[in-house]
Amino acid sequence: MTTVAIQTYFQELRDVVDRVGREKVDQIRQSVQLLTACLRCGGKVLIMGNGGSAADAQHFAAELVGRFLMERKALPSIALTTDTSILTAVGNDYGFDEIFKRQIEALADPRDVVIGLSTSGMSNNVFHALTAANQVGCKTIGLLGREGGSIASIVDVNLTVPEHHTPYIQTAHGAVLHLFCDLLEKELFTPSGQTE
């Protein structure tokens, strides 16, 4: 392990995050606007992903239900990755591609925003769930990677990290989700953004 290898890793990671900050401002703004409108009108946020993206989904839901930086009321959010009984029952009876779709069919309301995370943009179970969310009338956001894959064309906001190295995509997704939390708290709970 060399100093150069360590420094190179962090430089490459900075480059990816900086690129998102330069090139994805409009998509970030659109996402926060959708989320703000959803939460103001009594909707909830449903979020999902696989593997590391499942962990990111749970982290984001925890920040909304708990708090991010500001002491404030809880915000309704559900990570569709957490109920092992539902995941295994649906996976066993219907197949892995249906594990999130069935939950969308059970839980989603047209006021909701559904977020799908996929570093490849090709996760079938996320694709099917977002398709179901569109049918319900939800707004949809894709936090994707690489070229956005099949999911990019079916979401209201396509926020693709233009990178092929999965760990860098996941780190950028985490930064974007933290930014969502920060901006949502400011929009919903500070005098300049608050409408209540």
Curated annotation (Swiss-Prot):
Its main location: cytoplasm. Binds 1 zinc ion per subunit. It comes from the Bacteria. Gene3D superfamilies: Glucose-6-phosphate isomerase like protein, domain 1. Keywords: Carbohydrate metabolism, Cytoplasm, Isomerase, Metal-binding, Zinc. The keyword Cytoplasm applies. Substrate binds at N50, G51, G52, E63, N92, D93, S118, T119, S120, S123, Q170. One of its GO terms (biological process) is carbohydrate metabolic process. GO terms for molecular function: carbohydrate derivative binding; D-sedoheptulose 7-phosphate isomerase activity; zinc ion binding. This is Phosphoheptose isomerase. It comes from Syntrophotalea carbinolica (strain DSM 2380 / NBRC 103641 / GraBd1) (Pelobacter carbinolicus). The gene is gmhA.
